[in-house]
């Protein structure tokens, strides 16, 4: 199922109205710790500290520490444009209720000027709806990637990375025309991010002549994949695994123990270091898995990327290489800091100067140039990758092709079972 823009507007408006009622009932001060005239700018950071993506807070802090460390600051703050920037962290469990509660606390109790985050897709949609109710606060996304967040989002909300459908661009054509996959079984988590991520792949795959020959949408946190593996049709050419974090690692492990011999196509976060670095025994399932996303392969190098990787490696609890979450949080937080500096820390007039800089930002990030479109959505470079085994036995990405200047489309996806559902 796909949603048109009219339906999306109605959904966001309804969600925003419901949150507005909840906000009014809760009382308390709304944001604006600086309100343009003080010497302190408060930034509230949302990141997952529990659940399937519990590592999100560590990755967020690593990214922020790298960005602020380059300005003689640390994970808790720095001096930016003559203002004291104070960071307040709020952990979530990846659910909408948790994200809403923590965002409201940051704005209405802690009095932050800017909300930065969250990590996951459903959280992101909730935060956009909340942003509609507090227009005096600026929101900069962390890594949440549903398509609709910026297509019809709040004017005070900015995203400095691609959406999850953009990330799979080119992979569907490659699967059919280069890999020869004609029938693919769909396995993915049942929430907004995988809908768009899988939709971006399968719309292209189906248009190229491919067929979805079965589908399983599973709850986040699923631990038993044996029954799903058993029902994969024998004539399947490949399995699409739209899973992330602990779920992806669990599936890959069970794919090995249950004798899955079909090639795999990974959703963007299924091939992330957070899934590939935990179990050395998953190589037989993971090697050869193709995917697309914002993280380049192991051979990628430029001075900005190399500096980022080196600084990331010094952070507590760092993965062998920067995860997608660390990269997106870094690119997004650095974008915020560059804009604060360009605005000279001015948050007056409903943060007009800051928002103008955010809307028009252009810079060379570790993974390529970032510019913004009229919807406050980034135009970015994208990487199609394949999982390979390095000489030391570790699983890493190897880039197949790079696409520069990828722009957002206008299709928002829901659950689908067949190619006919997304045509």
Predicted feature locations:
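Solvent-exposed, acidic/polar segments of extracytosolic/periplasmic ligand-binding ectodomains
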Residues: 359-423
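Short, solvent-exposed amphipathic alpha-helices that sit
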Residues: 56-75, 98, 167-170, 192-211, ...
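Extracytoplasmic ligand/sensor domains, especially the bilobed periplasmic-binding protein
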Residues: 112-217, 263-291
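Short, low-complexity disordered leader/linker segments with a strong preference
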Residues: 1-42, 418-423
């Amino acid at each position: 199922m796909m949603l048109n823009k009219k339906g999306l507007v109605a959904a966001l408006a309804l969600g925003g109205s419901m949150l507005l009622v909840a906000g009014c009932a809760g009382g308390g001060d709304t944001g604006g710790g600086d309100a343009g005239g003080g010497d302190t700018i408060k930034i509230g950071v949302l990141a997952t500290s529990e659940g399937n993506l519990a590592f999100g807070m560590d990755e967020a802090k690593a990214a922020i520490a790298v960005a602020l460390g380059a300005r003689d600051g640390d994970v808790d703050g720095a001096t930016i444009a003559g203002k004291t920037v104070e960071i307040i962290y709020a952990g979530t469990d990846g659910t909408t209720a948790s994200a809403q509660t923590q965002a409201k606390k940051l704005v209405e109790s802690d009095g932050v000027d800017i909300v930065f985050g969250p990590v996951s897709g459903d959280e992101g949609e909730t935060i956009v709806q909340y942003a509609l109710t507090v227009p005096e606060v600026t929101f900069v996304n962390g890594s949440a990637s549903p398509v609709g967040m910026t297509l019809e989002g709040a004017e005070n909300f900015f995203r400095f990375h691609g959406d999850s459908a953009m990330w799979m661009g080119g992979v569907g054509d490659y699967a059919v025309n280069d890999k020869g996959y004609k029938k693919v079984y769909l396995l993915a988590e049942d929430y907004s991010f995988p809908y768009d991520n899988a939709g971006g792949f399968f719309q292209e795959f189906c248009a190229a002549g491919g067929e979805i020959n079965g589908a399983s949408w599973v709850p986040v946190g699923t631990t038993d994949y044996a029954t799903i593996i058993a029902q994969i049709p024998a004539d399947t050419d490949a399995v699409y695994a739209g899973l992330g974090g602990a779920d992806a690692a669990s599936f890959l492990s069970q794919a090995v123990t249950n004798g899955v011999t079909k090639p795999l196509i990974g959703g963007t976060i299924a091939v992330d270091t957070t899934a590939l670095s935990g179990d050395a025994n998953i190589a037989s399932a993971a090697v050869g898995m193709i995917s697309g996303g914002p993280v380049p392969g192991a051979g990628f190098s430029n001075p900005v990327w190399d500096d980022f990787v080196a600084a990331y490696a010094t952070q507590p609890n760092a993965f062998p290489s920067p995860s997608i979450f660390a990269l997106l949080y870094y690119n997004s937080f650095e974008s915020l800091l560059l804009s604060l500096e360009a605005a000279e820390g001015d948050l007056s007039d409903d943060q007009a100067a800051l928002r103008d800089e955010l809307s028009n930002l252009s810079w060379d990030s570790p993974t390529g140039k970032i510019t913004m479109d009229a919807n406050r959505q980034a135009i970015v470079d994208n990487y199609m990758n394949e999982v390979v085994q390095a000489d030391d036995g570790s699983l890493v990405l190897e880039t197949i092709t790079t696409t520069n200047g990828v722009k957002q489309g206008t299709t928002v996806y829901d659950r689908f079972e067949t190619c006919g559902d997304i045509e």
